[in-house]
């Protein structure tokens, strides 16, 4: 596996692959890899001739008071894991490389970013779309893989890719969970044992909602009420949002119909965790 840290070298490598007719699968990450990331890499490995993974803790998507400085970083560990998943190139640029002095350009997707995480994290998605657009232009992948756990992010990136005519196929991959149901996240390492146990309330609330839907419940207000009651029964949990939206446009719905997204953001202690479930009725 090759480690690349400069944009020029990364772009030159990608151009060489294109000249030789090889397809590139791309998995953008912020590092501190876990099984969810490795699942994306394996999907890319199965489908593409070459696999590139980026590791970049993007300062643009962190707001004031968020965990940019303490976000877990371990490039040696991540390199070992990426290589074990069959990755060809690990692209790990510095912030100075990505955003040199005088940088003033941003990508902003409207409407889809107004609710859910966009409401409580202003500027977050502008940071996400800016860095992903830059990475697409640098790596020049044929296919890019994203986890469904960040469902709003996935919808926003698909919208950006379509609107800007970027020649990349965006593939969403189902959430990877721990054996007890907790959605895998790099931020799970922050949790104390007690908080780790409390965090299971997210997947438990979604499972309760699924039971109700399978029993015929279609009223969104009723579903939100049950989810909220389930979460608030956990003393360490504080709800940021419980939302049920159309899965494509991320707009609120009153009745379940078609493909909908049930999305949660909950603080467990000091840590903000997200989870979601897509339902089709």
UniProtKB/Swiss-Prot annotation:
Recorded catalytic activity of this chain's protein: (R)-pantoate + beta-alanine + ATP = (R)-pantothenate + AMP + diphosphate + H(+)
Disulfide bonds: none
EC nos: 6.3.2.1
UniProt keywords, alphabetically: ATP-binding, Cytoplasm, Ligase, Nucleotide-binding, Pantothenate biosynthesis
Keyword set includes Oxidoreductase: no
Protein family per UniProt: Belongs to the pantothenate synthetase family.
NCBIfam families: cyt_tran_rel, panC
Name this polypeptide is given: Pantothenate synthetase
Organism this protein belongs to: Heliobacterium modesticaldum (strain ATCC 51547 / Ice1)
């Amino acid at each position: 596996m090759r480690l690349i840290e400069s944009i020029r070298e990364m772009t030159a490598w990608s151009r060489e692959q294109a000249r030789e007719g090889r397809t590139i699968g791309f998995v953008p990450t912020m590092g501190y890899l876990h099984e969810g990331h490795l699942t994306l890499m394996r999907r890319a490995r199965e489908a593409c001739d070459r696999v590139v993974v980026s590791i970049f803790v993007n300062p643009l998507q962190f707001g004031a008071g968020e965990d940019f400085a303490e976000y877990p970083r371990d490039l040696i560990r991540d390199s070992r894991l990426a290589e074990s998943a069959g990755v060809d190139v690990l692209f790990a640029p510095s912030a100075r490389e990505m955003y040199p002095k005088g940088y003033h350009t941003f990508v902003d997707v409207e409407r889809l970013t107004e609710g859910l995480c966009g409401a409580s994290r202003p500027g977050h998605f502008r940071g996400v779309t800016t860095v992903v657009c830059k990475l697409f232009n640098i790596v020049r992948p044929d296919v890019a893989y994203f986890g469904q756990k960040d469902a709003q992010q996935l919808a926003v990136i698909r919208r950006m890719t379509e609107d800007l005519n970027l020649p990349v196929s965006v593939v969403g991959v189902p959430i990877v969970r721990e054996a007890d149901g907790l959605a895998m996240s790099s931020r799970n390492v922050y949790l104390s044992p007690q908080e780790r146990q409390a965090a299971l309330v997210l997947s438990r609330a979604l499972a309760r909602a699924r039971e109700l839907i399978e029993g015929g419940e279609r009223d969104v207000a009723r579903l939100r009420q049950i989810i909220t009651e389930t979460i608030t029964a956990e003393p360490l949990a504080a709800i940021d949002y419980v939302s049920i939206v159309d899965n494509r446009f991320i707009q609120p719905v009153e009745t379940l119909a078609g493909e909908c997204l049930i999305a949660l953001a909950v603080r467990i202690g000091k840590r903000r965790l997200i989870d979601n479930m897509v339902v089709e009725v």
